[in-house]
Amino acid sequence: MTKQRRLAIKMWQEIVDKCKAGDDFYLADYKADFCKKHGLDWRANCYFCNYFDPCLKCPLDDKCGQVYCKVSTKHDVTSAEIILNALR
């Protein structure tokens, strides 16, 4: 497993945890901050985008991570878990 994939799993696990905790946050901001902290450009790596695999339809309401989609509902937790499980 690549370092970027491991970091993506860590990031999506944190997103799932934040959703379950009921935290309100903007997904694009969170991902940009996470990747900046780890020296990555999330826009250039599909693991860090909602469309993490071009062959898989995005489960997050067809919105790219560059759209400021708010993550706080049960549906969003489920969507984030789908991505997390697919990355594992």
Regions found by a protein language model. Give the residues of each.
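Cysteine-centered metal-binding/redox modules
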Residues: 1-88
